[in-house]
Regions:
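Active-site rim helix/loop that mediates acceptor-substrate recognition in acyltransferases
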Residues: 31-52
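Conserved GNAT acetyl-CoA-binding A-motif
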Residues: 101, 109-120
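Conserved active-site alpha-helix within GNAT-family acetyltransferase domains
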Residues: 98, 122-140, 145-146
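Conserved beta-strand in the GNAT
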Residues: 54, 60-69, 86
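Conserved acetyl-CoA-binding loop-helix of GNAT-fold acetyltransferases
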Residues: 93-106, 133
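A short, internal acetyl-CoA/4′-phosphopantetheine-binding micro-motif in the GNAT/acyltransferase core
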Residues: 85-92
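A short beta-loop-alpha structural element at the N-terminal edge
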Residues: 5-21
């Protein structure tokens, strides 16, 4: 794909349809069946600590990244946590994911955020390679999940 036909946009209040389409894309790429909660989408797009950047090919959502700004208690400022990043399967490996991360990093710099972090499962070699290629530093950690 020629990237000159891809546009990038930071979603905000009023872009609920685009966010809805991104959630459907996440479901497709991650092979999940998450519901689209319209109320949560509206609330998230009105939350200044939430960032959603989307890649469009013409008017179709073909990729996106979501992240949360988390206030630090041990140092001034905050950090950014990437929650999800996905690109439509047919558009992967064309620079769209890298550009989404680059756009998020620029948004962080503009806000004075000095650290961005993301989790990738060790078994997801593609994701691990992707973040390493972008210059991310890897740390061995364990994630614990509690079902409530």
């Amino acid at each position: 794909m020629n990237n000159k036909y891809v546009t990038y946009k930071k979603l905000q209040s009023g872009n609920e349809k685009d966010f809805h389409d991104l959630v459907l894309l996440f479901n497709d790429v991650f092979e999940t069946e998450n519901d689209v909660n319209k109320e949560n989408i509206r609330r998230l797009l009105n939350n200044p600590s939430f960032v959603c950047l989307v890649a469009f090919h013409h008017h179709e959502v073909i990729g996106g990244i979501t992240a949360y700004e988390l206030m630090s208690y041990d140092k001034p400022g905050s950090v950014m946590y990437v929650y999800d990043l996905a690109v439509q399967n047919i558009h992967q490996r064309s620079g769209i994911g890298s550009r989404l991360v680059s756009e998020l990093l620029a948004d962080c710099r503009q806000k004075g955020i000095k650290e961005l972090f993301v989790q990738a499962e060790e078994a997801d070699a593609h994701a691990v390679q992707f973040y390493q290629k972008l210059g991310g530093e890897s740390f061995k950690t364990r994630q614990f999940h509690f079902n409530l």
